[in-house]
Amino acid sequence: MKIPIYMDYHATTPVDPRVLEAMLPYFTTEYGNAASKSHAFGWKAEEAVEAAREEVAKLIGASAKEIVWTSGATESDNLAVKGAAHFYQAKGKHLVTCKTEHKAVLDSMHALERQGFEVTFLEPERDGRLDPAKVQAALRPDTILVSVMHANNETGVVHPIAEIGRIARGAGVVFHCDAVQSIGKIPFDVEAMNVDLASISAHKMYGPKGMGALYVRRKPRVRLVAEMDGGGHERGFRSGTLNVPGIVGMGKAAELARLERDAEAVRVTALRERLRKGLEKELDLLTVNGSLEHRVPGNLNVSFAYVEGEALMMAVKDVAVSSGSACTSASLEPSYVLRAMGVSEDLAHSSIRFGLGRFSTEEEVDYTIRLFGEKVRKLREMSPLYEMVKDGVDLNQIEWANPH
């Protein structure tokens, strides 16, 4: 077993050796530009790009013509949300999303608000899932876009996307789904889920970083305004020379996900349950955040009461975990996702996200259980609040002195 142990698979995944192997020739011998139509170097590159497009499409039940390459899911989210809003704004300027979306969606929505659009931010239930009835109630005659993620990046909670998509489709509203954390882990089918636009990332499914895709439905056709001008690549949706090695890597990652996903999900779920039960046996006052029933296989988001999440992370340097999402973990604010779910500020501050994946082992899980048990107990020994609770004091009944 190698130390440190990687348990942050929602932040990124290692590149699968089979993916790297598929990519390497496109750095060295097959280095053509896929847009060069006049010679064999270009044709070979284009062939590889189209084969990868086919693989990504197959993974989500789409046609290859509906896949647009991007530099990653942040760009896909921006292109989907802003591109759809700008194209359909003559029809209306109202957008609907959820408070627990990824920052790439939320900040795109805030940018559109500054341009005169109106956004309804819906609250999830206590278990982290969004009730489709709330989406239905939020729709107005001038609503042009609904954007709801499939699986949350912090809690791993899976939203009822098929139902939300059906509601949007029935109202003639474009439906975008950020499917970054679910694709490759659980089934995702654009037809069954009534999705019009879907964001996909390579590095969340054992592919390279800086590589993504956007699914854009053709029937009924969804239109977007391009957010980047240039040579008109990718049917004008996304100009810029194609990253052929990255695309080949994403295609291979998609193929492996399609072939191995279901068996992998069973194994990783068993590891997660081993971790959860082990931690619950070692420690008291431990809360799992979000629905355990509706959740991606490798995610465990836990609050350790009376322990500061950041302090705990410093204490367990041998295990790579995170508090909050990797994109916002540099700020010491409590997780906005957990706060939107109604988790108290104290418990949100004490949350840790464990992410298990393809290369995680039972040995690593058992080591993590022992390490967290030891370190949490040590930190709680220094907590006067924990002492009081163990002595039977109800903290809610205490009148704290006002420091101001």
Curated annotation (Swiss-Prot):
Its EC number is 2.8.1.7. The modification N6-(pyridoxal phosphate)lysine is found at residue 204. It is found in: Cytoplasm. It catalyses: (sulfur carrier)-H + L-cysteine = (sulfur carrier)-SH + L-alanine. Its main location: cytoplasm. Pyridoxal 5'-phosphate binds at residues 73-74, 153, 181, 201-203, 241. InterPro entries: Aminotrans_V_dom, Aminotrans_V_PyrdxlP_BS, Cys_deSase_IscS, Cysteine_dSase, PyrdxlP-dep_Trfase, PyrdxlP-dep_Trfase_major, PyrdxlP-dep_Trfase_small. Keywords: 2Fe-2S, Cytoplasm, Iron, Iron-sulfur, Metal-binding, Pyridoxal phosphate, Transferase. It is an enzyme of class 2 (transferase). One of its GO terms (molecular function) is cysteine desulfurase activity. Its cofactor is pyridoxal 5'-phosphate. [2Fe-2S] cluster binds at residue 327. Pathway: Cofactor biosynthesis; iron-sulfur cluster biosynthesis. The active site is at residue 327. PROSITE patterns: AA_TRANSFER_CLASS_5. GO terms for cellular component: L-cysteine desulfurase complex. One of its GO terms (biological process) is [2Fe-2S] cluster assembly. HAMAP family: Cys_desulf_IscS. Master enzyme that delivers sulfur to a number of partners involved in Fe-S cluster assembly, tRNA modification or cofactor biosynthesis. Catalyzes the removal of elemental sulfur atoms from cysteine to produce alanine. Functions as a sulfur delivery protein for Fe-S cluster synthesis onto IscU, an Fe-S scaffold assembly protein, as well as other S acceptor proteins. Belongs to the class-V pyridoxal-phosphate-dependent aminotransferase family. NifS/IscS subfamily. Homodimer. Forms a heterotetramer with IscU, interacts with other sulfur acceptors. This is Cysteine desulfurase IscS. It comes from Anaeromyxobacter dehalogenans (strain 2CP-1 / ATCC BAA-258).
